[in-house]
Every structure is written in C-alpha cells, then in structure tokens.
C-alpha cells in the first residue's frame, strides 16, 4: 500500500519540566490605606477587608501601591501572591515563583465540605460581602480563587482539575 515510502516511528515529545523559581513577595507598604480604598470602591465590605489584612492574606505593596492577595500552605507559609493595581489602569499579575496550588482562599471556621470557586480574589471577596449583607456568616464557607479562568473539556472526564482545587480536596 505504501510502495517505496519509508516507515518511521512517530516522534514522542516529552513535556519539559519547568525549573522552580524562588518565590518572591512584593515589598510591603507601611499601611494598606490605598488598597482598602480600592477594595471598598469595588464594593467589598470593610470588616472583611480588615480581617483579611489582619490575618495576613491581603496587603498593599510598595512602591506601586498594588493590592496583594496571598495564599498560604498548611503551615501558613506564603506560597502564592497575586497583585492588582489600585489606579484606573488595569494592571495585574502573579509574583515570581507563585505556586498555584495555594491561591488566595478563605477557609471555613468549621468542617464544611462545601467549597465555592471564583475566578479571582475580588470575586471571592464580593461573594463574602453578599453573604454578610444577607445575614449569613461568611466565615462558615470555604472559598477559593482560581486566579484565572478554568475551561472544562468537551468530555468532563478529560478535564484536569485545577491544582488549587485538587490540593484543597486532598485535606
């Protein structure tokens, strides 16, 4: 059937392992006033903002005054940082070496099996604000920001679970 054509084995490409980059947190400002103003302007409840700042999950960076959303591992060691500009320019990104297994999250005070997923930290904080406004205890919910859009495959069985969700479900 193939005549004089030679037959070659298919080439197999292996996915290159990415070299781990050292995680670097943005420089922290002496206060978080601009970050607070920005988040309040976005409709986030001030008590929720202050709680996140006091628990070390949000701060304002220097010299650009970005809001920094942090993710920690089980030992409360920082592993992830996402920053967002507080001015009118749409500026955002992840800190060098961030581990997506530990994105920004607010975990329940109790043993809740329910988890709410959000594209971004701002979406997560907006939902917490809505819960509070409706009279619910926002601290009784596991809320995880995916820090980016997640698209499933046509066949759900072929979809990969985002690493931050996989990491949460292992607990």
Please tell me what each predicted stretch does.
Residues 62-169:
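Phosphate-handling DNA/RNA-contact segment within nucleic-acid enzymes
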Residues 7-101, 109:
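Basic, glycine-enriched DNA-binding surface that flanks or lies within the catalytic cores of DNA
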Residues 1:
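Short Cys/His-based metal-binding microdomains
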């Amino acid at each position: 059937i193939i005549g004089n054509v030679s037959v070659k084995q298919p080439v197999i490409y292996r996915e290159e392992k990415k070299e781990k980059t050292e995680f670097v947190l943005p420089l922290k400002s002496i206060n978080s006033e601009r970050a607070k103003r920005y988040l309040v302007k976005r409709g986030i409840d001030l008590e929720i903002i202050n709680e996140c700042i006091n628990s070390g999950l949000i701060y304002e960076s220097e010299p650009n005054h970005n809001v920094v959303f942090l993710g920690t591992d089980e030992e409360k060691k920082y592993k992830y940082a996402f920053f967002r500009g507080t001015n009118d320019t749409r500026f955002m990104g992840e800190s060098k070496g961030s581990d997506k297994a530990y994105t920004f999250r607010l975990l329940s005070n109790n043993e809740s099996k329910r988890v709410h997923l959000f594209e971004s930290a701002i979406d997560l904080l907006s939902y917490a604000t809505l819960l509070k406004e409706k009279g619910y205890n926002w601290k009784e919910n596991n809320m995880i920001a995916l820090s980016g859009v997640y698209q499933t495959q046509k066949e759900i069985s072929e979809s990969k679970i985002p690493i931050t969700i996989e990491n949460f479900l292992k607990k």
